Amino acid sequence: MRLSQLLVPTLREIPAEAEIPSHILMLKAALMRKLASGVYIYLPLGQRVLRKVEQIVREEMDRAGSQEVLMSALIPAELLKESGRWDVFGPEMFKLKDRNERDFCLGPTHEEVFTDLIRNEVKSYRQLPLILYQIQTKFRDERRPRFGVMRSREFIMKDAYSFDMDWEGLDKSFNKMYEAYCRIFDRCGLKYLVVEADSGAMGGKDSKEFMVISGVGEAVIAYCDNCGYAANEEKAECLINQEIVEEMLPKEEVYTPNVRTIEELVNFLGITPNKFVKTLIYKAKDNVVAALVRGDRDLNETKLLNILGIREEELELADASIVEKVTGAKVGFAGPIGLKGEVMIIVDNEIPQMRNFIVGANETDYHIKNVNYGRDFKADVVADIKNVIEGDKCPRCGSPLKIDRGIEVGHIFKLGTKYSDALGAKYVDEEGNEKPIIMGCYGIGINRTVAAIIEQHHDEKGIIWPMSVAPYHVIIVPVNVSNEAQNRVAEDIYAALQKEGIEVLIDDRDLRAGVKFNDADLLGIPIRITVGKKVDDGIVEIKLRENEEAEEVKISDVVEKVKNIIKEKM
């Protein structure tokens, strides 16, 4: 392809709305343009990268025995009402009515549609096991689209579903998909962790996320270098110190005028934050919940939601009027002792192992010290509701945990019979008995994978594409297109590489060499061939985008050299 004919309107300035490298570079390198908040148009280079990633996904899914289909993006409400998810998704699902006032949605995910297909078409054990997948645009009305395609309202996803006769079969399908995902992300040139995760609104269990380590990732990951344990923040656990050596002391009320936060208490009492227990008052649907965690910890609301069995939008911190009603005190002095009315107390599993901690007294300007669980108060539920922190002990081996940020690019989990029960997807076994089909679900965000690749493969000059997903493998840059010898050699190399089936660009624009080099670096094409002054000596330069140094190569050797580089890097 000739660069003079390619729609590639690169930008010199950083777009105002772009916050992270992938968003900045996808706009600067003309991979995409913004149409609306969270909605993007892909230009030719961006579309080529998307197709490269999709091709890798297709090859590995097919290799794993999966079959590609294509479902409708428009889903009738009846299907989601059968599963109970029409209301579960809440405002993030795009809902609409047709001209006959029938309810539909733009698919945020497709469990029900796949299950509906299978309940109608699969009747016998002879038709199982089965894995189906599609690559299709999904829609979610994100409250706050940000970071470009990292959190957008329209995105391309590969979603696959396995259908098995029993749990043993699901285990085999799950492992096939796990291995396929590892191959996909390896081929995309990504460094990633596979972490334990929460299934969220999708349901199911044995949930794993494929996380690309990146400082701009929205997910927090806890992992252990010693044993390989890894989990996202919503699922991460740690060992609790079981050894209690401190004797219980008599509890004592302490005057703490206008001292409301943990930080203020630390300064006022001169005690470290891990000796405090904070009581957070929540409104959970129509109930009030007091959730207790150690003073230096954050409460994990996903863990709390799972315990309560409610949706995210049904949980919120209580307002001042509710806090004052159940505690009898102003905000900032809540504690577990003497709460008024029907309040469900949920205590983090670390607290029963603490001694002589400090809590709010449920009296304005007062706290209580030397409080102990069991003696002074009890909970309705004791469970893990905290976020782990750096240095916590690994739940498997006891080594210190590390904390990092990651971008979720893939998610696999075992659905079991959640949807087959709800929609009646059954098969008849060898004995003639009717049984529910056992399902698994497997997703990859295609756009997000592209962004994650850029996050891990860029420098101050631009993108550094891995060979496997680069829009073109080679860019030829004649330094001076007006120079007949340079132009002729550049065109000859261009034709020779095309003949070999190599994806090649030629920068035939009549621009300064510096501008061309800058664009080549910005676009991230893996191999640059510079045709310059040494062309009369039969020499050109080959430079890899990932390296600083260029190598002089005989013109007669260029094609073979390029073929070898591509073979090595693919």
Curated annotation (Swiss-Prot):
Catalytic reaction list: tRNA(Pro) + L-proline + ATP = L-prolyl-tRNA(Pro) + AMP + diphosphate
Q: Where in the cell is it found?
A: Cytoplasm
Tell me, which GO biological process terms does this entry list?
prolyl-tRNA aminoacylation
Q: Name one GO molecular function term.
A: proline-tRNA ligase activity
EC annotation from Swiss-Prot or TrEMBL: 6.1.1.15
Principal place where this protein is found?
A: cytoplasm
Give the UniProt keywords, A-Z: Aminoacyl-tRNA synthetase, ATP-binding, Cytoplasm, Ligase, Nucleotide-binding, Protein biosynthesis
Q: Which domain of life is it from?
A: Bacteria
Q: Pfam family of this protein, just one?
A: tRNA-synt_2b
Question: SUPFAM superfamilies this protein is in?
Answer: Class II aaRS ABD-related, Class II aaRS and biotin synthetases, YbaK/ProRS associated domain
One Gene Ontology cellular component: cytosol
The record's subunit annotation is: Homodimer.
How does the entry describe the domains?
Consists of three domains: the N-terminal catalytic domain, the editing domain and the C-terminal anticodon-binding domain.
What biological function has been recorded for the protein in this entry?
Catalyzes the attachment of proline to tRNA(Pro) in a two-step reaction: proline is first activated by ATP to form Pro-AMP and then transferred to the acceptor end of tRNA(Pro). As ProRS can inadvertently accommodate and process non-cognate amino acids such as alanine and cysteine, to avoid such errors it has two additional distinct editing activities against alanine. One activity is designated as 'pretransfer' editing and involves the tRNA(Pro)-independent hydrolysis of activated Ala-AMP.
Q: What is this protein called?
A: Proline--tRNA ligase
> Source species, please?
Thermoanaerobacter pseudethanolicus (strain ATCC 33223 / 39E) (Clostridium thermohydrosulfuricum)
What phylogenetic lineage does the species belong to? Bacteria, Bacillati, Bacillota, Clostridia, Thermoanaerobacterales
